[in-house]
Amino acid sequence: FAIFSSLYCVQPMMPILADYFHISPTQSSFPLSFSTIALAVGLIFTGLISDRFGRKPIMVWSLFSVALLLLLSAVLPVWSVFLATRVLIGLTVSGVAAVAMTYIGEEVAAKDVGFAMGLYISGTAIGGMSGRLLAGVLVDFISWQSATLIIGLINLCIATTFYFLLPKSRNFQAYPIKLSRFITAF
């Protein structure tokens, strides 16, 4: 939920961002486009990084980072810096998107993996939809900055809950990060 709500919450804000930052409608699509591109790039690396440092630590780091970056992006008055935070959000979102299914595969009993994967995937869809809806409703009543702060605070609560409730990996085995493993993965 948290990762894709963070990614897509800017979509209903695009016209407001265009007015606030004095940019074109095309440029107002950059926050979502750049964060999605950064997500795609991050997905290549975060799986390998989690092979070294563990699944839960990467996912926890990702969730807290995304929440903090959302909070930061709400107070940035400069377009280029706002865009940079959106790129960082895309990169950090990949820490959950790439690792969660591996965690499920390693830690959930084989008979329950399908159900757990379904819950995760439905959570991502609900997150993407609810991020858009929540932001869209909020910006009808409050500023885009306040809406972003609220979504960031919700994500911070989710990250904290995740940290305390997700069990530590029992079946994880660390592997060193090697360029050869990265190359052979392709």
List each language-model region with its residue ranges.
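Helix-loop-helix hairpin linking two adjacent transmembrane segments in secondary transporters
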Residues: 81, 110, 119-166
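Residue-level signature of mid-helix packing/kink "hotspots" within the transmembrane helices
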Residues: 8, 36-44, 128-129
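Cytoplasmic helix-loop-helix junction between adjacent transmembrane helices
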Residues: 85-124
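Extracytoplasmic
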Residues: 1-25
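Conserved MFS/SLC helix-loop-helix module at the cytosolic interface between two early adjacent transmembrane helices
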Residues: 41-79
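Small-residue-rich segments within alpha-helical transmembrane domains of MFS-like 12-TM solute carriers
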Residues: 4, 8, 90-98, 129
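Juxtamembrane intracellular "pre-TM" segments in multi-pass secondary transporters
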Residues: 167-186
